Amino acid sequence: RAVPQHWKSGGANRTAEMTHAPLPPQGVWPSPADARQWPFFHRGIEGEIALRLGQDVTPAQAATLDVEQARRLVDAMCVSIEVVDFRWAEAGAAPTWHKMADSLSHGALVLGEWVPFQPLDWSRQRCVATIGRQPTTEHVGTHPLGDPAFLLPAWLRHITRTGHTAPAGTVVTTGTW
């Protein structure tokens, strides 16, 4: 497989440069997942949305895509949990290039149940997270891009930049909610 199957992608906002990192397959798990045996250093979690390509995307296709065209290439979505991890002593304060070398501070990815993709009003979507006995957190409409699909054109250009086609079934998790 020339193009890795699982990716993370995102940016701080719509005007920021999007960053992308392939994810090691051994650290991508279906929900429910037990992460106790996985080696973490500074573990945290982020609630995210993952999108799955429903068809192959060639480099020529990716080169000209806009967001609406890219949306039509997605067949499914799911809630995902990225286990964020830092292998640098500075953790989240590490320089950007260090974070990029660290798979953008990635530890593992848990994928929920896939459902057919449909555009939603992301400004109204709730994310409620409870971990053990910690206080529950709730976020509404807080995705930094406003719509997780916004990153699709940049991500697809990135993953096809070496001339390889992104196969159907390729997955991207789209940044914290």
Predicted regions and their residues:
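Catalytic-core "active-site belt" of small-molecule-metabolizing enzymes
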Residues: R1-D147, R161
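Glycine-rich, small/acidic residue-mixed loop/short-helix segments
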Residues: F150
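Short alpha-helix capping/helix-loop boundary micro-motifs
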Residues: R157-I159, T176-W177
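Extended mid-to-C-terminal alpha-helical interaction segments
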Residues: I159-G163, P167
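Conserved metal-binding segment of the jelly-roll/cupin
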Residues: A166-W177
